[in-house]
Amino acid sequence: FSTNIDLTPFYDSLEDNTIKGHALSSVFGAKTPNSEWEFLTGNSMAFLPSGSVVYQQYITDTPTSLVSNLKNIGYTCVAMHPYYDTGWSRNIVYPNMGFDETHFIDDFDQTKILRDYITDQELYEKIVDRYESKKSNEDLFIMSISMQNHGGYTEKYDNFDEKARMLGINYPDVNQYLSLIHESDSALEYLISYFEKVDDPVEIVFFGDHQPSLSSSFYPYLNGKGLGGLTLSELENLYTVPFFIWTNYDSDKESVELTSLNYLSTLALERAGIALPAYNQFLADMMEEIPAVNSRGFYSKSQGKFLHVEDAAGEDAKWLKNYEILQYNNMFDKRNK
């Protein structure tokens, strides 16, 4: 569909020193922590019961993750989320994950609000503040989960001037969401522009947690069917989010047609020139054969289509079974870790 303005001109312009593309999330419309978990651990919701929320069910001690791997080589690990600390038990989970610092809503300027939520701009300024206060020899990993564009999108707000709209048809909630994305693009330009100028090597990994839940009448307009009766490939379109990995130093420009959130930390480590731990090396190898996997299924490179995990055959089945075994060992098999 067409809009009255370019929604993400800065994001669209990012090419140099950037890997950019689309990734499968395992959730739609809600349950952000499952996306966080897939990114941080390299594990997949494909092997957990439907409806699971990992943060509330499965994290009772420190799992092997990007956090533990970076701490092992001397990084300070910081989590930032400009909302209440008890949401999805993050006040318990983040320390259990090994984060050295956590910053929640009380650590942000609560006058910097768009609709009901702290802005991306305020979050990014907090990231900059933490970077500028670091010790001279301190290596930092900062994970931040934004709130600005959180659903729903049906109320009108005095503090938000909606600039974007669809042309030729009117879905008010979609227009609000598109306007929020436009605001996010401006904040992203601030963040990248700042770190372009610093002397330290910096890598920024940016991805959507899930697609928004919008008016049910919008989806037939979008895909001709709505939310029911979809093929697996059509369903996976609803679970696809944008991502990029940008560096402020010279790195290859790359376009990725499709990956999944469980692979992003491996891509980030490779891009940063950090030696891959054994689990991430397995994921890097698996990625060559199965480029994307999530709670709904996987993309089979050999067959050129999406399949349900239970329908995997041949080498696909071997990769997925080994992945499931390694994930079980990573999550539950404390005796044999």
Residue ranges and their predicted role:
Residues F1-K337:
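Solvent-exposed soluble domains appended to multi-pass membrane proteins
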